Swiss-Prot record:
GO terms for biological process: translation. InterPro entries: Rbsml_bL25/Gln-tRNA_synth_N (IPR020056), Ribosomal_bL25/Gln-tRNA_synth (IPR011035), Ribosomal_bL25_b-dom (IPR020057), Ribosomal_bL25_C (IPR037121), Ribosomal_bL25_long (IPR001021), Ribosomal_L25_dom (IPR029751), Ribosomal_uL5_bac-type (IPR020930). The keyword RNA-binding applies. It comes from Nitratiruptor sp. (strain SB155-2). GO terms for cellular component: cytosolic large ribosomal subunit. Belongs to the bacterial ribosomal protein bL25 family. CTC subfamily. The gene is rplY. One of its GO terms (molecular function) is structural constituent of ribosome. Part of the 50S ribosomal subunit; part of the 5S rRNA/L5/L18/L25 subcomplex. Contacts the 5S rRNA. Binds to the 5S rRNA independently of L5 and L18. This is Large ribosomal subunit protein bL25. Pfam families: Ribosomal_L25p (PF01386), Ribosomal_TL5_C (PF14693). Keywords: Ribonucleoprotein, Ribosomal protein, RNA-binding, rRNA-binding.
Length: 178
């Protein structure tokens, strides 16, 4: 379980001091839930997020244990270091928006015809309760030829979950290599 600290001071000086000590600044929030200003060790946070198996993962901040979902993050424009992360509390039964990762399996037949697999969306926005949201969406790209694409409307979601992205948007496709 990822453990963090509660930040007492939320000012610029305190934030810079925490970042200098290797902490990642985080805000934890939810519907009818008080905001928590927290900080996590950057290495521990990245390791936890990379190796998590579910969309929601447990964190312990102060004396509270919460299931949270990464809602948004901010990176430094030059060094690409993680600066800030917004974590939303995954409350059962509460319908809200989530970003679900896309995974592809298979080798497209279009690669043999001088095509290149292009992933347009790595995550798609969906709406539903956390218990209905899939941990990831797996797309089989083995039937894609040059010029073919998988659109949002082609992706099947579980009952109680709906797309929040326009149905004509391409997620993955095979284009002709130049």
């Amino acid at each position: 379980m990822l453990e963090g600290i509660v930040r007492e001071s939320t000012g610029k000086k305190a934030t810079k001091a925490l970042r200098r000590d290797g902490y990642l600044i985080a805000n934890i929030y939810g519907k009818d839930f008080p905001n928590i200003h927290a900080a996590f060790k950057k290495g521990d946070f990245i390791r936890t997020v990379r190796h998590k198996e579910k969309l929601a993962f447990p964190v312990k901040v102060g004396d509270k244990e919460l299931e949270v979902v990464v809602q948004e993050y901010q990176k430094d424009p030059v060094t690409y270091d993680l600066l800030h992360v917004d974590l939303m509390v995954a409350q059962p039964g509460v319908v809200t928006y989530y970003m679900v990762p896309i995974k592809t399996v298979g080798t497209p037949i279009g690669l043999k015809n001088k095509g290149v697999l292009v992933t347009s969306k790595r995550r798609i926005k969906v709406k539903g309760a956390i218990e209905n949201i899939p941990d990831s969406i797996t797309l089989d790209v083995s039937n894609l030829d040059v010029g073919d694409a998988i659109l949002i409307r082609d992706i099947e979601l579980p009952e109680g979950v709906e797309h929040m992205t326009a149905p004509h948007v391409a997620v993955v496709g095979v284009v002709k290599a130049k």
